[in-house]
Amino acid sequence: MECEACIGMGKDCNSWMKTCAAHEDTCVTFQTEVIAAPVSLTVIFKACGVSDTCHLDYMETTLHDKVKVRIKRSCCTGEDCPLPPFPGLGFQVNRPNRLHCPACIGLFSKECTEHLVSCRASENQCLTVTGKEFGLFFRALSYKGCATESLCALLKKRFWDGLEDIEVDFKCTPALPPPSLASDV
C-alpha cells in the first residue's frame, strides 16, 4: 500500500508517495492547530497509519489557559485510497470543565517548572510526555498538561514508531478535581 506523505505549515504540504510498512493499512492526515492566543499556527501531516486508531479522530491538550493544541485526523483505508480527505478543524468554544493538571513545557530539557492549568471541554486526563530523541527538532523535550482520552489512547498505540529518530515516553493519569478551599475553622 502507498500513501501520500509530508509535513508542512498551513492546510497543505508538498507530498510524495510512500510505501507503507506491512502493519500499516490506512492513509492518515493530521491537521494540528497550535493556539497561543491571539495567534494560531496550523500544521498538516500526512502518513501511513493503522486503521484501528481511525476512531480517534479528535484530540486536544492544554498547556496554559491561553495555549492549547487541537488535532483532527482523517483516515482512508484500502488500496484505492492513498489520499485521505482533509480533516477540517472547525471553530470550537472550549470552556473550562473544573478539572486541573500540572502543566509545563521544556523544549530542550527533560524537566520543566510546573504550574496548575484548567482543563477544557472533554479534557479529563493529565498528560506527561518526555522526549529523549525527537528527530531533527529536539534532543530533549518535556511536556505536561490536560489531554483528551482520545489523545492518550492514540499515544498508547505509539503511532510514531515508524518514524525515525523519535524516542518518546508518555503517561496519562486522571485529571484532578478543583482544588478545595481551605477553611479557617
Swiss-Prot record:
Compartments, record wording: Secreted
Q: What are the record's GO terms for cellular component? A: extracellular region
An example Gene Ontology molecular-function term: phospholipase A2 inhibitor activity
Q: CDD domains, from UniProt?
A: TFP_LU_ECD_PINLYP_rpt2 (cd23572), TFP_LU_ECD_PLIGB (cd23630)
The protein's UniProt keywords, in alphabetical order, are:
Disulfide bond, Phospholipase A2 inhibitor, Secreted
Disulfide cross-links: C3-C27, C6-C13, C20-C48, C54-C75, C76-C81, C101-C126, C119-C146, C152-C172
Primary location class: secreted
Q: Which InterPro entries match?
A: CNF-like_PLA2_Inhibitor (IPR050918), LY6_UPA_recep-like (IPR016054), PLipase_A2-inh_b-type (IPR016338), PLipase_A2_inh_N (IPR004126), Snake_toxin-like_sf (IPR045860)
* Name of a matching Pfam family: UPAR_LY6
The regions listed as transmembrane in this protein's record are: none
Q: Which domain of life is it from?
A: Eukaryota
Identify the tissues in which this protein is expressed. Answer: Expressed by the liver.
Question: Which Gene3D superfamilies does this chain map to?
Answer: CD59 (2.10.60.10)
> What functional role does this protein have?
Inhibits the enzymatic activity of phospholipase A2.
| Similarity field | Belongs to the CNF-like-inhibitor family.
Subunit structure of this entry? Heterodimer with phospholipase A2 inhibitor 31 kDa.
Q: What is this protein called?
A: Phospholipase A2 inhibitor 25 kDa subunit
List the source organism: Naja kaouthia (Monocled cobra)
